[in-house]
Amino acid sequence: MNIAVVGLSHKTAPVEVREKLSIQEAKIEEALTHLKGYPHIEEVAVISTCNRLEIYAVVTDTEKGVVEITQFLSEIGHIPLSYLRRYLFTLLHQDAVRHLLRVAAGLESLVLGEGQILAQVKTTHKLSQKYKGIGRLLDRLFKQAITAGKRVRSETNIGTGAVSISSAAVELAITKVDDLATRNISIIGAGKMACLLVKHLVAKGATSITIVNRSQRRAEELAKKFPQAELTLVSLDEMMSVVGKSHLVFTSTGATEPILHQDNLREVVSAEQGLMLFDISVPRNVATNVQDLEIVEAYNVDDLKAVVAQNHASRRQMALEAEGLLEEEVEAFELWWRSLETVPTISCLRTKVESIREQELEKALSRLGTEFAEKHQEVIEALTRGIVNKILHEPMVQLRAQQDIEARQRCLQSLQMLFDLEIEIEKQFS
């Protein structure tokens, strides 16, 4: 059994590739069921955010398991394998463990140290439990990752004042306009990202903000959090009318297809006013063809990289502090995993050797007869037990210390074969 992660992120793939592989929460159960149907995948969990899709799996055969995950990604994204492979990364064993801990800590985020990813890792864990995607190994790994993420945020300052995707989008907007207070601004969507957009827009002086959302209740819940902002709430039916009156539009919905495109924008945007679009959704809410309209400027999540570059520079030292904490958590998981694998074999070997010792001791004592004093029997008992312990001690220490997973498994298999040990493999992972 080995742990592998196959995926892509803002570091390896552009948004036009990431959006094809985005898996909405409503589709997670189907994805987990599909993946667990492959012959070499025992456990699986899926992290899907605007900046990454990562599939963590416990595989019975590393190479074949990775091929199965890659095939799955090709199928759901309708992307040829030859094209997809250039954007994927694959990490195995301890590298996969370390990567998940880094993700949970915000060290792999576009915005270094951002806090939203930890909540997303928690959601992945809960959904994987709910839909029976994970077993003992990944359950422990995700718990370790959540612990690591919490430690990094409580024991370092990396999360203090960290920008988010939403705040980065607002910062980008500020570089494009002189004064937010003089602009009509609309936000399409009323989820967590939209809430953060309102927070940062209000902080930067925006006074005219309209929320466009399908659910009136969700929009009202958002507005209650900002009573001082006097937000205007409208239904999705009025979206294009609102967009036509706006100077800046931020989109943050769960739509799987673009909701703004060249045809519907051309009808409502005036040449005198123009329009700036900031799309922080993946899949994108704004079609690429809007760039053909001279009166429209459109930006997506990949355009935020320049904005967050300064954030990375100022947080590198804090990231180094976080790395040390993460290594402690990686080692804690590795120790647990090593014990999980080695304990059944060691226990079985000790039981077998002890049985042999007792049998041979009994034979020897029976030959010596009843005249052999009881105190002498105790000495021989201690002697044989000491010999067994001395012989087994060093091999067991070396086995537990073996950090290379495949080498450790080869050692275990050799022990099981050489001593004819009957190990129930399921006990190690059940």
From Swiss-Prot:
| One Pfam family per UniProt | GlutR_N
Q: Which domain of life is it from?
A: Bacteria
Broad class of enzyme this protein falls into: oxidoreductase
Q: In which pathway does it act?
A: Porphyrin-containing compound metabolism; protoporphyrin-IX biosynthesis; 5-aminolevulinate from L-glutamyl-tRNA(Glu): step 1/2; Porphyrin-containing compound metabolism; chlorophyll biosynthesis
Give the binding site residues for NADP(+). Answer: G189, A190, G191, K192, M193, A194
Q: Where is this site: Important for activity?
A: H99
Q: Which PROSITE patterns match?
A: GLUTR
Keywords, A to Z?
Chlorophyll biosynthesis, NADP, Oxidoreductase, Porphyrin biosynthesis
Query: Its family?
Result: Belongs to the glutamyl-tRNA reductase family.
Q: Which NCBIfam families match?
A: hemA, PRK00045.1-3
Additional observations: During catalysis, the active site Cys acts as a nucleophile attacking the alpha-carbonyl group of tRNA-bound glutamate with the formation of a thioester intermediate between enzyme and glutamate, and the concomitant release of tRNA(Glu). The thioester intermediate is finally reduced by direct hydride transfer from NADPH, to form the product GSA.
Q: Subunit structure, per the record?
A: Homodimer.
Its annotated function is as follows:
Catalyzes the NADPH-dependent reduction of glutamyl-tRNA(Glu) to glutamate 1-semialdehyde (GSA).
Q: What is this protein called?
A: Glutamyl-tRNA reductase
